[in-house]
Each structure stands twice: as C-alpha cells, then as structure tokens.
Swiss-Prot record:
UniProt GO BP: mismatch repair
Record Pfam families: DNA_mis_repair, HATPase_c_3, MutL_C
Signal found in the keyword field: no
UniProt keyword annotations, A-Z: DNA damage, DNA repair
Gene this chain is encoded by: mutL
Protein function: This protein is involved in the repair of mismatches in DNA. It is required for dam-dependent methyl-directed DNA mismatch repair. May act as a 'molecular matchmaker', a protein that promotes the formation of a stable complex between two or more DNA-binding proteins in an ATP-dependent manner without itself being part of a final effector complex.
Keyword match Secreted: no
SUPFAM superfamilies: ATPase domain of HSP90 chaperone/DNA topoisomerase II/histidine kinase (SSF55874), DNA mismatch repair protein MutL (SSF118116), Ribosomal protein S5 domain 2-like (SSF54211)
InterPro entries linked to this entry: DNA_mismatch_repair_CS (IPR014762), DNA_mismatch_repair_MutL (IPR020667), DNA_mismatch_S5_2-like (IPR013507), HATPase_C_sf (IPR036890), MutL/Mlh/PMS (IPR002099), MutL/Mlh/Pms-like (IPR038973), MutL_C (IPR014790), MutL_C_dimsub (IPR042120)
Family statement drawn from the similarity comment of this UniProt entry: Belongs to the DNA mismatch repair MutL/HexB family.
Gene3D superfamilies: 3.30.230.10, Histidine kinase-like ATPase, C-terminal domain, MutL, C-terminal domain, dimerisation subdomain, MutL, C-terminal domain, regulatory subdomain
CDD domains the UniProt entry points to: HATPase_MutL-MLH-PMS-like, MutL_Trans
Recorded GO CC terms: mismatch repair complex
Name of the protein this chain belongs to: DNA mismatch repair protein MutL
Amino acid sequence: MNKIRFLDKYLVQKIAAGESIDRPCSILRELLDNSIDSGATKIEVFLEEGGIHKILIIDNGIGIGKEDLKICYLPHTTSKISSEEDLRKIETLGFRGEALSSIAICSNISITSSTTGNESYQIEVENGIEKCFKKQPAINGTIVNVTKIFHNFPARKRFLKQEPIETKMCLKVLEEKIITHPEINFEINLNQKLRKIYFKESLIDRVQNVYGNVIENNKFKVLKKEHENIKIELFLAPANFSKKSKRHIKTFVNRRPIDQKDLLEAITNGHSRIISPGNFPICYLFLEINPEYIDFNVHPQKKEVRFFNLPFLFKLISDNINNFFDKDINSYNEIVIKRQLTDDDNLIEMINQPKNLNKTNTYDIIQNKNLETEHTVNDLSKNIIQNDIGLRRYNSIIQNRPSFKENITNIFSDKFLEFEEPPNKNEKEEIKFNYIGQIFSEFLIVEKVNEIYFIDQHAVHEKIIYEKLRNSKKTVQKLLIPIEFTIVDKNIEEIIDSEIEEYKKMDIIISKIGPKKYQLESIPNICNQYENTLINFFQSRKSRTINSLESDLYANIACRKAVKTNDILSLEFSKFLIDEFFKLEIKHCPHGRKIYYKISKFELEKKVARA
C-alpha cells in the first residue's frame, strides 16, 4: 500500500492559509493592502473584539468587476502580476493572489463591489466555498466583511490572545499603513465607536499625528537624500533623546514596514557617536527603491526584503545619519512638532469632532498644518560672561604619580595630536569661566553664565583626544614584521573581505593569506603601539561602515590615554580641560555617553526655596 498520497484540495488550502493568516491582524493587513492597491483615497476600518468577531473594510477604490468578483477568492488569482517578469518590478503591496483565498478558507467573507458606481454585486464565501452571488444597491468602491474568524481552525482560535492584545496588534498594523500612506484618509472604528480620523496630509504631518508625542520637546529633524535609484527620508529625534528599546526605530521600504536587522544596524550605527551603549535612537526611515533592485517575495508576510547592494545601502544610511549630526544645525531645517495628543496610544484616542462636522463630507476636509519650520543658528560664542557666585575655590593637589604625569605630557607633545581649529573659531578668544574645583576625584565643577557644570574628567579628556585624533594629519607606517591574525566567524570574514579596499583609504593595509587567515602590513602612524587593538577590531567586526571602525578605533585609543577616575588633576590641567570643553562645545564622549550635568542658578534657588 502506498504511503505517499495527494492531499485533499481543501486540506491543501487550509495549510496554505495557516502560513499567511495567523491572527486577525494578518487579515486586516491583507485587506488594507488590497484597498490601498485599488487606489482608494478613503478607507474606513471597523473592528469588533480585536478583529476576532468582525473585520469590516470600506474603501472608495476602483472596485472589482462582476466576473472578477466570482473568482477573486480562489487561490492564486490576482490582477497585480501576469508573468515572471512582473515579479522583478513589483510596485503593489499584494501580488501573490493568496490573501483572499486564505481569508475565505479560515472565515466567512462577504465582498460587495462596483466598478461603475451604478450597480454592484456581492459574493458570500464560507470555508472557501461560494454560498451566494447577488446584485446589490449601487456603491462606490468595495466593502469586505469578515466574520467567524478561525471557526474551522479550533487550534488556531484557541491560541488567540485576549481582546485588548489582539486589538493592539491590529492597531499596530493600522499604524503601519496610516504612516506610509498620508495621501489616504483613514477612519478607525473600534467596537462600533468612532475612535480616530486621519485626514489627507503630507508625510511630515502624518508623522506628527502618529508619532508626535514620542519625544518630550516634540522636535524632529528631517533628513532627505537621493542617490540614483534610492531615495531616503529620515525623521530623527534630537541627539539627546534615546530609548531603552528598539521599538521606536521603524523602517519602511517602498511603503512596506520591514523588520530588517541590517537596516536597524545601519540606523544604530549612524547614531553610535551620540547615543550611549544600551540605548537606541528614535528614528523613522522611509526608503524608496527601484523595484528592480529589491525582492519582496522572501517572507510570507513580506516583512523582509532582499536588497541588490545591501553593503552600499547600509553605508549610505549610516554615513548620512552620522554626517547629519556632525554638521552645524543651521545647515538643516528643524521641524517643530506641536503636541496634539495626550494619550499614550494615538490610535485609540477619542476624537473631538466639531459640532458642525458632517459625516458625509469628512474626507473633503484637509487638516490645517500644525508644523512650523524653524531655522536655528549655532552660535558658538554667545553669552560667555564670568560670574562670581561666591563659592570657595580650592586648588587640586596632584599626587606623586610619575607615570601618570609622563602620560599627560606625551599626549599633548606628540605631533600627530596637533590640529587646526575650525575656521570660525577665534584662537585668541578667551573662554571665561570660574573653576570651582575637583570633587570625588572624578568631576570638575565650573561656574559659567549663572550655571554650574559638573564635568566628567575622564569623558571630557577622552573626547578632546578623540577629536585631535580625528583631525590629525596621518601618514602610512609599514610594519617591519607583518602581524598575522585569524577570523573565526564566517560572517565577519565576509565583511572583512568586502572592505579590504576601503581599509586602504584609512592607510590600513591587510592581505588575506589563506582561509580565515590575514596579515596586517601597514597602519596609520596614530595607531602605532595599538596594533593589538586594531586586530581586536577586525576579529569582532559587526558593522559594515568604515567610518564606524575609524571612530571606534580612535575612541578606544582616547579611552586608554585619557585621565581616569581617582586621578587628582592639577589646577592648570583642569583649566585646560574646561577650556577645551567649552571651546569644542563637547556634549558626549566618543561612546555616546553624556559628559556633564548642568544646573542653573534659578534651579538651584528653587531647590532651597529661594526662588
């Protein structure tokens, strides 16, 4: 007796449906994709019990014709592709022809649609079988009503979460579609109550309405870049804002939400010099790429994508973010977001509609812009005045530490640490401050313009050395005896191989001498005596951006050379660190950690009830 047999057609469809439809939010995603692909400018969403009981979508798209309606629920029927060539240039959100058939198998679905606006037809399908096809009163667009979800998938239904959790998952899907399609009006109804309306608006305004309350001072920076077949639009929080989780890093490729580790790494890598380890930036990335250079057909829910040239894209994103925060702020427009919402969950906040708002013309109203653009000028030398607050100054006593003293001398006598000040700095200009003293052998206390600064001595010295290293003139130093090293991790080996030519631009010459084996032949003069540090960088390489390696290398050298906690500093050297701190306008150490804490005279008076 044969053990291998053909599966029943209905069973095959149930298995296929289980792969793409795992919970109500999956159904919602597929239906929204269809509405968006239909060219709809208005989409109404009705959810009951987190989508478990009912999902109803109404759109004003081009609709489905009578004959197409009869077959639209069958497996692998689609209007979006017709040949293998079409797979290479997909521009629609859906394309496989699986969505409606999978939904029809695991629920009861009713579709009413019209292409003319004069007459419409309705088809009702239960368990993948047509039950009714009839003429209906005229509508403009399509209505899809899904009920009894997973009634014939008892195991799947048993593992659904409680209503609030399923609702939250559906709202996340809605958020993804709302943010990527600002040209569409969305109306959201939960359990037969109107919850939120998003009007047609610009992408900037849509980001405001969806994410505007994420950062306290409501300021986003907008970075736009174009390169051949790639268009980048980034919404970045100011450098002093970060989160403990990655959930506020969101990436969208051709209007699809993508969970791609490489894109996440590119964004975090670009922020690595301003955000401390363990924290993550607030960033929303929108990529538009020629469809011929990407492949979305790699994940059942299209959450991943293959890029034609991922290393280049990684570098483009990372370097542009890095350069963005390096440049003067007056080179960019700062978008000021006015906080409108007070509820943590924007999507479920009740909307306060004007009394005269007519439901029939809601979508003809375009919301007033709530963004204003400010051009902020980075004035590096204003308000530098000395004030005496009467605190007792004391002179720090340097202990008898010859090796430490010698280290300080070497740092600032080496020629490669000399660098020119930026042209807009006045070298003769004296930075006025009142040095109070050193506390806990760790912090320097300074008074300047009615403010008190507590400065981390190690971090500020580390940053000063780091900046001198970055701006120094470098020369190539050939090693008398090349240093051999091994790369064990295959992924790291691939990264090193792809970047060997780039290392040459940094005056770092390495050669591959066998499988997983390399030798270091030349290094920049500033890396002298730090060859082992460089080898460690190669062996633990995770980033694809050369600038990151260079920055991390300099940060490591600076960390080794900088003064440490418990080092007692002389008065002269302390003043030097403070002068450089104000002159370079230092805010973060090379690892992204904050260098100082500041409190104003007014705040201090408030603490002691004098204000």
